[in-house]
Amino acid sequence: MIRSQQLKQKIKPQGEIAHGIGNSYADHSERDALRYFLANCNPFQQFWKNYFGTPPNTILKEDPLGEYGVDLGIVTKSNINNETTIHGLIEVDVFNSWGETFPAHYKKFHVLERKLKYFEGTNYKYLTCTFNNTHTQMCCTTRENIERCNLLYGVTEMWMPAIKSHDRVVRCPLDENVFWFGVA
């Protein structure tokens, strides 16, 4: 528990760089960017449709697992009993060091171990999307790839220079299972 609190304190300043003082976990810009890509990026629209399918009467809901859970969910709400059915989950993030071009020294897509709890023990589809610092480029990967990489490579404790601390990640190679999209 102490390690978790220490990590949060180290992450907070980086979050404030991305989202403003006092808003270290307010990723509204990334949520809006995902919606923009859905509306304006045909390749991403097709990828989304292929991955999640097209369940009828769904909406993109913020915080479908609660305030401190995953960012977005594809959900259907029943008119009969007000029950919500989750069809998929989406985590969004920003990589502050990624400007116009992806940093050449990064050879892996990192998925934070602490985010795996959002889908473990469920059958939900899951997509994690990382945006560049201008929200014009995005890379993402799926639950299936994360699980494959976790099985093949495990979880790695890595030094994260931006937060000056170690964090635990699943490292996914930048291969055909990591998808890249851009908008003008």
Regions found by a protein language model. Give the residues of each.
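Conserved catalytic cores of phosphodiester-cleaving nucleases, focusing on short active-site segments
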Residues: 72-100
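An acidic- and aromatic-residue-enriched active-site/binding cleft used to recognize and process polar
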Residues: 64, 93-97, 133
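Short beta-strand or tight-loop elements
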Residues: 68-70
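Non-catalytic C-terminal interaction segments of nucleic acid-processing enzymes
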Residues: 1-25, 78-85, 123, 131-184
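Structural alpha-beta junctions
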Residues: 38-56, 118-127, 147-156
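Aromatic- and glycine-enriched beta-alpha-beta binding-site module
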Residues: 89, 113-132
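Acidic-basic catalytic patches of nuclease active cores, encompassing PD-(D/E)XK
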Residues: 1-66
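Mg2+/Mn2+-dependent nuclease catalytic core
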Residues: 95-122
